[in-house]
Amino acid sequence: MNRPGNELLRQMVSSHLFGTPCGASRFFLVFLSLLCISTSSIADDTVVVRVSNSDFRTAHDGLIEAIESEGLVIGSILPFRDMLARTAVGDGALPYGEAEIVQFCSALLAAELVREAPAQLTLCPLSIALYTQVENTSEIRLAYRSPGNSTAGRQRAESLLQRIVQRAAELARLRW
């Protein structure tokens, strides 16, 4: 049985609001698709650079020098693999041969970021991970989370991270 109120609602949703029969369904499918696309791009914000022909200690030293050559000071170096090994549950199989995270900050960049939007304080300190994987300990990887390029400050942060990682990889190869 078709009620008058149901018919009115069906007409509003299918033709008046969206212009076609079943338009609402198409609208929501498109909306959900766009939501999934943007979620994928947000989740895929890690930049990884592989360093061949080096070892972990040399790559570590190259990373420290590359950060300091930008006039920045290291805030901390987190021994990530060791921390994970101490706190891991289960069988304890770790994917890393070695892994650490180097944190640093630029006061000028931090000030610019928070002037643009106070919540951007979450971008500081910047960090770059340095690691090898168990199955290939001769290949060192440098990785960082891209801050994106939606503001001028984020673009400068991305450029800084790119310069540091490229310089660190170059130093690691040259010194090995």
Question: Where is each model-derived feature located?
Answer:
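N-terminal secretory signal peptides that target proteins for export/translocation
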Residues: M1-A24
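Short, ordered beta-strand-loop transition motifs
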Residues: A43, L78, P95-Y96, Q133-N136
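Terminal, regulation- and interaction-focused segments at domain boundaries
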Residues: I42-G71, S76-L78, E170, L174
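Surface-exposed, polar helix/loop patches in the mature regions of secreted/periplasmic/lumenal proteins
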Residues: C105-R156
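N-terminal signal peptide c-region/cleavage motif recognized by signal peptidases
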Residues: S38-S40
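C-terminal partner/receptor-binding element of secreted or periplasmic proteins
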Residues: L142-W176
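Sec-dependent N-terminal signal peptides
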Residues: L29-L35
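Compact, glycine-rich, soluble single-domain proteins
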Residues: P79-L123
